[in-house]
């Protein structure tokens, strides 16, 4: 299934079986429970009780109170299609020591896409549309972008956490 993107191109969605959706949802709950405490306050995408609206409210408060002066917009081109599996597995293993969960994750990543009876396999990327995809995205971006941004700009930028507020 495809949905239109803002640039006019199409985005492929991974449509899973009902059984896979149930298991992915359960794994998403587990991963969220483990990683939610690690995610930065500035990260609002695909998180409980957070949304683009909460990010905008926080940014507005920062601008009104003069502790946020700049906004940096980050758009990772073809993000879901280019997630490195080896790094994603390392990031998950950093906090989760469950071989069964890691095996499930590997199966989902390697499942491929069937279109017109032909299965296309990939060596990278996270399928969009599955219940576990948003939390996997947040885990990957936490280590690859959020922590780097915090370390790189924390000392030179007051209100650094808000610069990433609109991610997601």
Residue ranges and their predicted role:
Residues 1-2, 6, 38-50, 54-167:
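Conserved polymerase palm-domain catalytic core
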Residues 8-10:
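Intrinsically disordered, low-complexity basic tails/linkers immediately adjacent to helix-turn-helix/homeobox/MYB/SANT
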Residues 12-13, 17:
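Conserved phosphate-binding loops in nucleotide/dinucleotide-binding enzymes
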Residues 19-28, 60, 70:
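Duplex nucleic acid-engaging cores and interfaces of nucleic-acid transaction enzymes
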Residues 26-31, 136-137:
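Active/ligand-binding-proximal structured segments within catalytic/core domains
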Residues 31-39:
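Glycine-rich phosphate-binding segment of PLP-dependent enzymes
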């Amino acid at each position: 299934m495809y949905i239109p993107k803002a640039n006019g191109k199409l985005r492929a969605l991974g449509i899973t079986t009902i059984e896979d959706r149930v298991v992915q949802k359960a794994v998403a709950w587990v991963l969220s429970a483990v990683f939610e405490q690690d995610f930065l306050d500035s990260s609002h995408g695909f998180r409980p009780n957070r949304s683009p609206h909460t990010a905008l409210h926080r940014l507005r408060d920062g601008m009104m109170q003069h502790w946020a002066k700049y906004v940096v917009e980050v758009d990772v081109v073809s993000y879901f299609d280019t997630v490195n599996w080896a790094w994603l597995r390392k990031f998950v293993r950093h906090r989760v020591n469950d071989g069964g969960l890691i095996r499930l994750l590997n199966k989902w990543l390697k499942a491929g896409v069937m279109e017109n009876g032909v299965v296309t396999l990939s060596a990278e990327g996270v399928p969009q549309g599955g219940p576990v995809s948003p939390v996997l995205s947040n885990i990957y971006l936490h280590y690859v972008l959020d922590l780097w941004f915090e370390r790189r700009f924390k000392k030179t930028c007051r209100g650094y956490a808000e610069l990433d507020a609109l991610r997601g």
